[in-house]
Structures are given as C-alpha cells and as structure tokens.
C-alpha cells in the first residue's frame, strides 16, 4: 500500500475523539508521525481529560506508528506554540497542522449570552489562527534557511453551518464562516513559501452532532467520521502541493468542492436611495438564492 505521508510530522487538534481521532489514525497509517492534541473537554468546552488523547496515541503506537500526546489548549497563544515546539523537539520538524478542535454552545440569537458567543469564537476561530500562525512562523524560518519550498500543510475545519447557515448557531456559524475566509486568505499569503491551506467541511456523526437528528443504521454508517479522513490525509501529503485555498465537503456519500461567494447581477451606482431600491428589486430575482444546509438553494 502506498503510504502518502511517509516520514511527515502532523499535529491534529481535538484528536482524542470523533473526526480528529480518525484523522490522526489515518495519517499514522499512512506513515505520518502524529502529535495527538486534545484537552479532553466536554462538547460545551468545559472540563478536561487527557486520557482520550492518550488512547489515540496508544492505538497509533500499537499499530506500529509513532505518536506523542499533547494536552495544550489549541486556542491559547502559548499552548499553540507548545504544540509546534513539541513536534520539532520530538522529530525535528513539523509538516502538517490539522485544526480540528471545536465546541458547541447552540442558542437562538436573542437568547445567546456573551460567554456562549465568546467561547465558541475563541475555540474555533482563534484555535485555528494560533496553531496556524506558529506553524507559519516556523516554516518561514525553515524556508529562509533552505531557500526551498517547505511543503507545509494547514488543513482547517469549517462547517455547512458556516457555509450555508443553520438556525440556532450564529456563534458557531460565524466562526466557521470565518475559518473558510481565513483559509482562502492564508493560502494566498503562504503560497510563496510552499505552504498549502485548505478547509474541510465534514458531514459526520460525532458526539457534537449526536443529538441533532435521529438516524437509522444506514444513515449512521454514511456519517461515519472515517469517510472524511481520506480527504484530510491526501491534502496532508506532498502529492497535494498544487491544491490550496479550497473548501471541500466530505461525508454522507460525497466529496464536493465548494464554490464561494461571487458577484452576481449588478447595476451602476446611484445617489438616490429609491433608485437603489428599484435596482435591487430588479436584480434579486436574477441571482442564485442562498443555499440551505444541504448545499442546495433555499432562500
């Protein structure tokens, strides 16, 4: 079997359970050495239990792979740097960062508290920015010393809630939409040193989605996290050097490349608000409607 990530060093945040665990296991099975990061928090971000990360690392080692445990908070500036430093100190390099850690604090906008907003934005958005920043800073130094592309990889995790919008998730959706935009911009910034940046929008049944809908056995099998990890593993490999700035949906029977916002119908600018309204009314029936959670037109 071809081992796509032979000799590469990957950091996976939130790798104790769910999607992150599957990513870590598949990366290791494909030859990567893995820093298994997980606080072991509850779905709402409270608590901590490093045993979940330890179990993933133990499973990697028992299968013949290499892994170390990291219990840092990925959304902490110092914690994110510790992850990068641990990879470099353990194996002399870091090649891949998979930003996967996340929490949920769902609430309708009118009922959402400041803490519920802040905690979700912190974990998802800063938890993507901080590891990416420290990895990019490391790669820039490596690039300057070698003069060669570093072939680094950042793989972020967005969501259909951020891409299409889901009621009751203004905090989560805003964070995930921010991650999609972050991905596109970071890809443009880091291309010159040989780093690719992509995002996965997974459709999978994990503890974070467990209570959202009732599923039969067939539906549950289609939502197994294992269907997402092959895309992550390929993007982590050197073979994916030419793929960057993309948002890719994976799971529930499909792999799909998402198409982002683009300008539709347009008209010349006007000074009169009534005329502006008339032009808007004229254009709106001509443009594509917003997508629903299934990626199809909704409103």
Name every feature range the model reports, one short phrase each.
Residues 108-109, 116-121:
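Substrate-binding pocket helix/loop in short-chain dehydrogenase/reductase
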Residues 20, 132, 175:
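Active-site helix of classical SDR
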Residues 2-36:
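Canonical Rossmann dinucleotide-binding motif of NAD(H)/NADP(H)-dependent dehydrogenases/reductases
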Residues 199, 218-299:
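C-terminal helical subdomain
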Residues 50, 54, 71-82, 114:
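The beta1-alpha1 cofactor-binding region of Rossmann-like NAD(H)/NADP(H)-dependent oxidoreductases
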Residues 132-133, 184:
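A short, exposed helix-loop element centered on a Lys and neighboring polar residues
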Residues 159:
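Residue(s) in the substrate-gating loop at a strand-loop-helix junction
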